Regions:
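N-terminal "arm"/small-domain region of PLP-dependent enzymes with the aminotransferase-like
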Residues: 1-58, 183
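Active-site pre-lysine segment of PLP-dependent enzymes
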Residues: 119, 136-149, 161-221
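PLP-dependent enzyme catalytic core of the Aspartate aminotransferase-like
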Residues: 169, 317-318, 327-361
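PLP-dependent aminotransferase-like
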Residues: 9, 97-155
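Conserved PLP-binding catalytic core of the aspartate aminotransferase-like
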Residues: 277-278, 288-319
Length: 361
């Protein structure tokens, strides 16, 4: 959603503060514009945030030693391969700032921060257009776009905003092509844990071959968007040093580190979130189709759909924030993205859409 608030253009979803300013802080809000866990922050994480307060008079550990060790154990990689940051967006910008590629490749559509970070360092960005006729799936033509002179390739698995995955054989060929061309593959796996089989879509096992930076975040799976905590996985010592140097010295606060440690213990919560998304995603997709929308068959915790009727303002007046995809390259104003929420929340969205579209729901 691109909105101007106090002369500031907002690129992403989740603008609850703008809604509160417009409609009043106590207005009933359903935010489906941000793809975070519908179960909210785990109780154990909230408790950890409160418990760490007495230690906040000291600087946080700049190396996030305990958290990096815990992440390494959870991911099955050495702790030395882990770099924590102020959300995955922090690490996207660090990658651009650290390497300053002259030319980079992204897909269209894709998460806007890739191109924003690359633009900030004067990089020429090439967009590989994903075809609507193929539901915006990545195809083998992408391999031909990875050629010498391209210094960085951003790929999202699953893609945002489509929610679609790439077949593993093609992912591996993309990585090999990047290595041959001398390009760093930055693979964004922030939504990977919402997939039916996350292990089938991660490239963690390929890290030791070099040329690969994997990005993940606590934001989505644990409902921790306000905490700001993400991490990168990389086997390259020299690259990690550059990424660390490109960031501020205390990028991850004491509360964020405490929250991350607590979140990694919330295995039951993760299972509950995954089960909820698995049950609700097809139900929400069917509801959107019944309203006449074209729905991309996403595999994560959000759905991309097309509707020719303007939806953003009518839904805002009904207390619902929906993500317009009009600012995504390769899409347009008729495309929208919605998070998959709880059953009652999804029902509220579908009922409101039915009112707007005159379907009598």
């Amino acid at each position: 959603m691109t909105r101007k608030t106090n002369q500031t253009v907002l690129t992403h979803g989740g603008d609850w503060a703008g809604f509160a300013a417009e409609y009043g802080a106590k207005a009933p809000l359903l935010d489906v514009s941000a793809n975070v866990s519908p179960l909210g922050m785990p109780a154990g994480v909230a408790a950890a945030l409160a418990a760490c307060a007495p230690g906040c008079d000291r600087y946080p550990d700049p190396l996030c030693r305990a958290l990096s060790e815990a992440i390494g154990q959870a991911e099955g990689v050495p702790a030395e391969w882990v770099l924590c940051g102020n959300g995955a967006a922090d690490l996207i910008w660090r990658a651009a700032l650290a390497l300053r590629p002259g030319r980079a490749l992204v897909t269209a559509p894709a998460f806007a921060e890739y191109e924003a970070a690359l633009d900030a360092v004067g990089c020429t960005v090439e967009r590989y257009a994903l075809r609507e006729a193929d539901s915006f799936r990545l195809d083998e033509g992408f391999l031909e776009a990875i050629r010498p002179g391209v210094g960085m390739v951003f790929l999202c698995e699953p893609n945002n905003p489509t929610g679609l995955t790439t077949p593993r054989p093609l992912l591996l060929r993309v990585l090999e092509r990047c290595r041959q061309a001398g390009a760093l593959l930055v693979l964004d796996e922030c939504f990977g844990d919402f997939l039916a089989d996350p292990a089938a879509h991660t490239l963690k096992g390929e890290l030791d071959g070099g040329g690969l930076l994997i990005l993940k975040a606590f934001t989505k799976l644990y409902g921790m968007a306000g905490v700001r905590l993400g991490y990168g996985l990389c086997a390259g010592t020299a690259l990690l040093a550059k990424l660390r140097a490109a960031g501020q010295p205390w990028a991850v606060s004491t509360p964020a580190q405490a929250a991350g440690l607590a979140a990694l213990r919330e295995t039951g919560y993760v299972e509950a979130v995954q089960a909820l998304i698995t049950a609700q995603r097809p139900r929400l997709a069917a509801g959107l189709k019944a309203l006449g929308c074209r729905v991309v068959p996403g595999e994560a915790n959000y759905l991309l759909f097309r509707c020719e009727t303007p939806l953003i303002e009518p839904l805002r007046r009904r207390g619902i924030l929906l993500r317009s995809c009009g600012n995504y390259h390769g899409l347009g104003p008729a495309w929208y993205r919605t998070a998959v929420r709880t059953g009652p929340e999804n029902d509220r969205l579908l009922a409101a859409l039915g009112e707007v579209l005159g379907c009598g729901n």
